[in-house]
Each structure stands twice: as C-alpha cells, then as structure tokens.
Amino acid sequence: MKKKSLIIASLLSFISIAWAAETIWIHQLDNIALGLDIKSTENITLSNDGSTVNFNLKDNAGTHSFNYSEIQKVTLGKSQNAVTIAFNGTDAEILNPYGFDGVTVTRSNSNVTINSTATEEVRYEISGTAANGSITINSSSPFTLALNGASISNSSFSAININSSALSTIELVNGTTSTLVDGDEGANGCIFSTGSLKFTGNGTLNITGNTKHAIACEQAIEIASGTINVVSSLSDGLHSTTSFVMNDGTVNVKSIGGDAIDGDTGTILINGGTLNLEVTAADKKGVKSDDKLTVNGGEINITMPADQGKAFRTKANMEINGGNIIVNASGNVVVTANDPSYCSIVKATGTFTMTNGTLKAVHTGTAGKGISADGNISISGGNISLEVSGGNGTYTNTTGDLDSYSATCISTDANINISGGTIVMIVKGNQAKGLKSNGSVYITGGNIAGTLSGNAAVINDNPSYCTLIKSDMDFTISDGTIIATHTGVGGKGISADGTLTINGGIIDITTSGKSETYTSLTGTGTYKSTCVTSDGKLIIKNGYVKAVSATNYAIGSNTSIEISGGITLACGIADSSTSDLSGITSVSGGTFINASGNMHNLTATQCSATTVKYASNISAGTLVTITDSSDNHIISFKAPQAMPQGCSITHPGLKTGGSYKLYTGGSVSGGTVIDSITQAGTFSGGDLAKSFKLSSNFTSL
C-alpha cells in the first residue's frame, strides 16, 4: 500500500503542476523510463483493483497501460529529442521518449538492445562507462547514434552491433572522447553494421578490434568529420563492402593485422580529411579496393614497413585528382611460387591516372615499386616525387629460368602517357628504372627530372641497366622537359626497343658512370653508359636534345639515326674506338652539334644539310662561335666537356658557297638562348680559330 500511495501522490502532483512540465516519465524497474507527451494525455487512472495504471490519451487516441508492479515511479520533466543511455559499470539508465512511437529498449545488465519500427529518424545518445556492455540496434529507418564520451568494452561481442538496411549515422559529440573495445570471440568488428555507416561530429573515437576488424560494414562507410583512432585491430582497421568515402575528419590506423582501409569489392573515394595509416603486416594494404579508387583531396600519410605491402591497391582503376600523399616504404619483395610479389606505393590492375595533387614517396625496400599498373598510366598534372633505393636480386621463374627483380619508380604492362605535371625521380638501386613501360611511352608535356646512381647488373649473361626511361616498344616526345644525370656504372638515360622519335620538347641528359666488362656464353662484353639509345630508328624532327656521356656515345641506334630538325648537342667520349653517335644515317636539317668521338664516321653522304667539321681540341667550358664573314652572329655553344677531336656543326644559317668564321672564347649576348646554345645574338671578343668558305654541303677544316 505504501508504493500505491507513492504512485497516487505522483499522479496528484501531475494534476497540480502539469502546466509547468512537458513530458511524463514512466520509470520501470529495469531503469528504463518511457516518455509521454503531457499535451497528448487526457488523464491518468488506476484500475478498480489497483493493479493497472492507465495513461489515457486525448481525443480517444488510446490508452497506455502498465502493470502497477512494473512501475518504479512517475516523474514530470522537460521533453527530449533523443533516447539517452547512460552506462554505469554493469548497469545503465535509459530515458526513451519514443517508447510509444515504435522504439523499444531493453537491457541485460549493461548490454542494451534497441528495436525500432519508427518511421522517422531517431537519435540515440550514449554516455558513461560499460565494463562489459554493448549496444545492439535493430532499425528499419535511418537513425543517429551519438557517442557522448562513452566507454564500452565487451569480452565476447561487438561493442556496437547494428542491424539495419537504412543509413546509420554515428556522431562523435564535439569535445568528447569515446572508447570502444570488443572481445576476442565477437562479430566481424568492434563496430559492426549490416547497413551503411556515416561518421559525423568533431569528437574522438578510440577503437580496438580484438576479434577481426575495428569497424566493419556490409554496405558503405562515409567519414564526414570527427577523429577515429584505430588503436589496434586483429584484421582491418575500417572494412566496407560497397564503398568507402572520406570527405573530412581524421582517421589514424596502426597496429593492425590486415589492411588499414579495405573497400572490399566496392569503390573508394577520398575527397578530404586526413588519413594516417601504418601497414605492418606482410602483404597488406593501406587503402584497398577491388573497384575504382579515387583521391580528389585530403592529406594521406602512410608508413609501410611490410614486405609485399601496398600503400594503395585496386583491382580496377586509380585516379589522383588532388590531395597530398606521402608514403614511406621499406618492405621487400617476396618470391612465392616462382613469382615475385612486390612492396608498392600504388598497384592498380587497371589504369592509373593523375591530373592534380601531390604524391611523394620514398622506398628503401628491395625491388621496391612506386606506381605500378597493368593498364595505361596517364599523368596530365600534379607533382610526383619518387625515390627508390632498394637492391636487386635473382630468382627462378615459372619456366625454370633465372630471372631478376629490381626497383622502379613508375611502371606498367601497357603504355605511359605524360602530358603535364612534374615528376621527380631519384633512382639508386641497381638495375632500377625511373619510367618502365612494356608498351610505348608518349611525352606531350610536363616536366621530368631524374637523378640516377644505380649500376647495371648481368643477368643470364646479359646486362640489365639502371635507366631513366625504358620503353619495350616506342618512345615519342613532342613537348615537355626531361632533365637527368646518371652516375651509375652502365647507366642509361632514355632507351627504347622500338622507334625513338623526338618531335619537340627538351631533353638534357648527362651520364658519367664508368664502363665494365662481363663474361657471357659468347665471350666477353662491355656495358657502357649512354644518354639516348634505341634498337629501332632514332628520329629527331624538332625540340632540343643535349646528350653528354663521359664514357660512351651520347646518342645511338642499332638501326638508324635520322636528324631533320630541332637542336641537338651530342657529346661523347674522346676514345676514337667509340663514336659519340652510333648508327647515323642522315642529317638533313636542324641544328646538330656532334662533339668528340669517332667523327670520321660522319660523311658528306650522310649530311645533306650544310655541315662544317672542326677537327681541333676544344677544352671543357669553351665557347665556340660561328659568324659570317662580317662577324654577324649565327650560333654559339659552350662545350659541356672536353672535345679533343673537335666537333661538327650543322646549322640552317650555314649555306654552301658562303664565307664564315669560327671563334673560341669571347662572349655572346641577346639572341635566342636554349641552355648553352645561343643563336642570332651579338658576339664579341674571342680568338679566331678558322676563316673558311663552304665549297660543298660538307666541309672539313
């Protein structure tokens, strides 16, 4: 009777002060209170036997009845727009304002289950500490789960388990830090959802996945804001199935046994925010998807010591249209079943495209790869900086033959197309390559800079070279800039197995690595450094080419060299046994300065364009100038290295029958300047070396 009196007192209190309150709170014995709008309530009555409390609604809208024994108390208070769950160790206090609108909340100790058939979006606010608790939500409509400084750990299950086909929003309440830890026998994730997840708010979430993933979702994951720290995870940090989208916020992932971000069979889209990822487990990835992977913005920092690891991995196409990416990799190649598996910055089974943004990576692992794609690689903008310094090695391939692996900055099984952007490559590993294409390479713009020091290595009695650009088919440049230095033994600048065509642009390559001999099945051979070389034709139609080799010929072809335009300065070694150019067929136009080497191979038959050969020593750094007989300037160039045998000069300003002068030293001003070559300027000073008349299209002085 005492309890009944308390209930009646509460009802009388309701009658007297209802005008000051908004909600009737019906507190049940399990610490769950249901809220009822006062304005919708006509009156509260007791059954005749006192066993039932009836809350009668206005306008005959119905009655909510409770067993008298189930009610702890009835209070009046303000309305609230959220279901609140406040954990307290193994207990929880719950206020449910939607208990009469399709939201049912039950609990067993600190394990809370929510079943919702509400048609409107419901908000759930979680706070307090649950020593061995969980939140399970079954909902048919979208909802928001607000973590307000909550700390939930569970020894055998997910901390948060969501069963819903609708969008579930997890809000990290501003200024708060929440912590979630699951057990080692739980579900797929410390947070697990069958439907899509969206993270909002500006709070912080620390999460540990002891069973499998830290966050697992069978649909999409979107990060709109907030900070998520994956403290550790047995498998992936964040695992989605249909898509992963990051628009803002920060995600930090470390100490994981799987991938940091795994989009599974879906897509990945990064528009903004910050990703700080560590890839420590072998053959795992920083950002992984089977479908398209796109970076439009944001800051991405990846540390990858894992052997066979991939910073970015997609079985489809990858695009970088913005953002800043920094990767530090040290993982090594691993040979499995006679096939090497590489540690790569980017690995795309499809194509790789970059239009903007920044990608900077340093890779010190053995045979480390920078950007690697099975399909075409297209770069039209942005800034790429890649450094590979890991060593090379050999293995037995699937056919039983000895094969090799080495580092590469950018490589593809198809074609490379560069039309813009800036690419800076530092290549230190032996056999390593800057750009490597199993197809063709097309340069129509952009800027490429390389610093190479890797040496050649002999594999199966054949040398494999450290090369700036290697094309297994054709190489064509029509615009853009390529500037490189190579100090490695047997180093190469640009090498094409097919036709090498220069239609424009600027090429400036210097090689200084020494030559070395090697023993093959057919005898002894020598690998030497070269600047520009091709197995097919080497065709120069336009542009500027400066090729300087301290130990070998500067430009060469195993088929033919055809020069019809542009400006070319080829300066090779002084050893008369080796030409500074190899395989020359014709010089029909343009400006061609052929310095040092076995120049007697250049004949009048080859030169239909007017050419003069000056066969006297020229010291390194000497300015060489040709003027007409009235000292009107035609061309000057500065010798990039010593020219003991002089040089030959082809220039459209030289005409058969004309009289000219050749000077060494002096100075030139004005005119058109490209690197160390000046045309149509003003010349003064210098020493007159020769006065001559061109009696034919080829004249030796």
Predicted regions and their residues:
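A composition-driven surface/loop motif
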Residues: 77-701
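Surface-exposed, interaction-prone regions used to assemble/regulate multi-protein complexes
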Residues: 24-28, 46-48, 52-66, 76
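N-terminal secretory signal peptides that target proteins for export/translocation
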Residues: 1-2
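Sec/Tat signal peptide C-region and signal peptidase I cleavage site
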Residues: 15-21
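Sec-dependent N-terminal signal peptides
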Residues: 5-14
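Short structural boundary motif marking the start of a folded domain
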Residues: 21-24, 51, 81-83, 622
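Structured surface patches comprising rigid loops and adjacent beta-strands/short helices at the edges
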Residues: 37-46, 67-77
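Short N-terminal segments immediately surrounding and downstream of signal-peptide cleavage
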Residues: 22-37, 41
